[in-house]
């Protein structure tokens, strides 16, 4: 009998709408993935594939563990509420009393009262894409017709709050917004947002090989390429995070939860929970496309990183395959010497392999493009992280660090 349960913890994120989206955000790396399925124009997950995903994912999970379903795109709301009602019903059918959770990333444009009532009823955690105030958000996040989307997203945010849906806000940090950290942060706080994640936008223009597949953006690899005009500069990303951290630690500890800070604290105290790109290895978070194809990672949806198909192979076969094992282990094995001797290695771990397309000081490939920014950020944090860890160890809340006699922000 084929092995059903993978050897170690894992996660499978679904993209039921494929790359289909109702927006045309300039910096999106996934819209163009439709080129990979040109021979099969249907890009929405059908009932058979949905059932296979739910059934196989639950079967592959240890009985004592929560089964965490994540729905992303493209834009997952394009499938309509009926699709997710069926997904929840299938989870109940195959879950047999298991603890099951759902999270959902959306641009928010199609959310209405009916959607939000459903999301609240079934305890979905919603990730809403919002880049900050209108002048920042609307620069790159536009409709197919090029119209701004900020008002539509703010309407969605209001609806999520009205229906008490658990949500966080996902903020893409681009070349423009990186220069306005407090404008972005304060706008979100003023809008009532409590959970925030900052995502650096880094993309390169396609080389000839990638362009032949109909793609405009560079595939991951160690070849340097021309950056897109919206890609954040490394030093500015570091300064962006430091500015927000300094602002947060003076007034918002225990009130606003910035995932980039949470991950840094987890690594500092040796706790689980840090994001994959700041772990020594990766490869345990795969994605399933609309037709059941499984890929090594959300950022590696390219033919050479396809692991198989949910209709033909078990999750265990694919995620424990030699190909995927090597993919995950290479995150550490291919670290250049400069990273291995770096004093923030255990905070950074080289970042996401997708961004390792620079040469290190000795001319060796594999240095993360964001290295300078990560160094700035991770070298700034330790005194504060230690102070918060000490407070917690003595039974005091981390928010006590905001008291004037404990807080000295470096200049």
UniProtKB/Swiss-Prot annotation:
Give residues annotated as binding [4Fe-4S] cluster 1: 21, 25, 28
Q: Which Gene3D superfamilies match?
A: Aldolase class I
The answer on whether this UniProt entry bears the keyword Metal-binding reads: yes
Q: Which GO terms describe its molecular function?
A: 4 iron, 4 sulfur cluster binding; metal ion binding; oxidoreductase activity
Annotated positions binding S-adenosyl-L-methionine: 27, 74, 129, 141
Q: Which PROSITE patterns match?
A: RADICAL_SAM
Binding of [4Fe-4S] cluster 3: at which residues? 339, 342, 348, 371
Q: Which UniProt keywords apply?
A: 4Fe-4S, Iron, Iron-sulfur, Metal-binding, S-adenosyl-L-methionine
- GO biological process terms held by the UniProt record: protein maturation
Answer whether the UniProt record assigns the keyword DNA damage to this protein. Answer: no
Name any cofactors this protein relies on. Answer: [4Fe-4S] cluster
Residue stretches in coiled coil: none
Q: Which residues form the active site?
A: 298 (proton acceptor)
Q: Known InterPro entries for this protein?
A: 4Fe4S-binding_SPASM_dom, Aldolase_TIM, Anaerob_Ser_sulfatase-maturase, rSAM, SPASM_anSME, Sulphatase_maturase_rSAM
Q: Which residues bind [4Fe-4S] cluster 2?
A: 276, 282, 297, 352
Q: Which domain of life is it from?
A: Bacteria
Q: How is the cofactor bound here?
A: Binds 3 [4Fe-4S] clusters. The first cluster is coordinated with 3 cysteines and an exchangeable S-adenosyl-L-methionine.
Q: Which residues form the Radical SAM core domain?
A: 3-250
What PANTHER family would the database entry show?
A: ANAEROBIC SULFATASE-MATURATING ENZYME HOMOLOG ASLB-RELATED
Q: Tell me which family the UniProt entry assigns to this protein.
A: Belongs to the radical SAM superfamily. Anaerobic sulfatase-maturating enzyme family.
**Protein name as annotated:** Anaerobic sulfatase-maturating enzyme homolog AslB
Q: From which lineage does this chain's organism come?
A: Bacteria, Pseudomonadati, Pseudomonadota, Gammaproteobacteria, Enterobacterales
